[in-house]
Amino acid sequence: MAMVVPKEGLVVMDKESVSSASSDSHLRLQPHFPDFTIPVKDFFKSREAREFLSGALAGAMTKAVLAPLETIRTRMIVGVGSRSIPGSFLEVVQKQGWQGLWAGNEINMIRIIPTQAIELGTFEWVKRAMTSAQVKLKKIEDAKIEIGDFSFSPSISWISPVAVAGASAGIASTLVCHPLEVLKDRLTVSPEIYPSLSLAIPRIFRADGIRGFYAGLGPTLVGMLPYSTCYYFMYDKMKTSYCKSKNKKALSRPEMLVLGALAGLTASTISFPLEVARKRLMVGALKGECPPNMAAAIAEVVKKEGVMGLYRGWGASCLKVMPSSGITWVFYEAWKDILLAANTKPLI
């Protein structure tokens, strides 16, 4: 039984009461973890989540169809086997059978899902964010910031949201998915050393550690930046100009296919020498003939094969990039239309 004795505002309790109060206090001090289900559900209801998923689905469907062209393209770029598309095709079939055309496709499918999800999702998100920022800053364009005798207007209207979004998309997807690109190239170029994904991962790790999965990251970023920027910029500008000239609000599926293919062709042609140098750097380590940097790789190609050596495999690349770019946009827009139409329902 507790005895309460008032003394200068204090409450005195016996041992039993203290023990009981301590027990109650202990119960009340149990850790309470926040409920993350609501923000997770909100995310999967968001436009961004649906755009990321649309990109993943579009990439997977496109890659499954075009894997043989990717195999031939990679072999020609790195200088393996025949110098012609038909010759390279027959060489692969004779040595490895028809399944050789899908060499590395396992890793291709694993790679393309996060790559396209991150790339297309990032492009859409950054484009909207940049456009919104420009609209907000336009309202205060007349305002000037003065620092001593120097004054300037905080305007960013001269910056293209599409170009920034394209560059951001390429950088983000490359940083996250580069190890998968390394694995794909090893499986494609040296199937005798890396016959499967399960063997390639431990062999690369034993030889070079974690750094082995990021071999050639610098050159990859250098090559990806102009390609990604040009690709998204060209597609968006062609789409906008075409819709304006035809007084249309949106492209039809065949029009997406054509404009996507043209954007891929333009971007690939501009950035192809950097792609050749990047592939030589990445695969050169396997032969013990790795140039020290991208400039050295380009110089080596020009010295051995002439300037046209920088475009070796360009035809195969266009044969792969053009349909890939066009089909990807068709699938992406189709999935986006489907998923955004049910915007009130969570994806999971």
From Swiss-Prot:
Solcar repeat residue intervals: 46-129, 157-241, 251-338
Biological processes annotated in GO: transmembrane transport
Bilayer topology: Multi-pass membrane protein
Transmembrane segments: 52-72, 104-124, 156-176, 213-233, 256-276, 321-341
Compartment annotation: Mitochondrion inner membrane
GO cellular component terms attached to this protein's record: mitochondrial inner membrane
Pfam families in alphabetical order: Mito_carr
PROSITE patterns per the UniProt record, alphabetical: SOLCAR
Swiss-Prot/TrEMBL keywords: Membrane, Mitochondrion, Mitochondrion inner membrane, Repeat, Transmembrane, Transmembrane helix, Transport
Function: Probable mitochondrial adenylate carrier that catalyzes the transport of ATP, ADP and AMP.
Family under the similarity heading: Belongs to the mitochondrial carrier (TC 2.A.29) family.
Annotated PANTHER family: SOLUTE CARRIER FAMILY 25 (PTHR24089)
Record-given protein name: Probable mitochondrial adenine nucleotide transporter BTL1
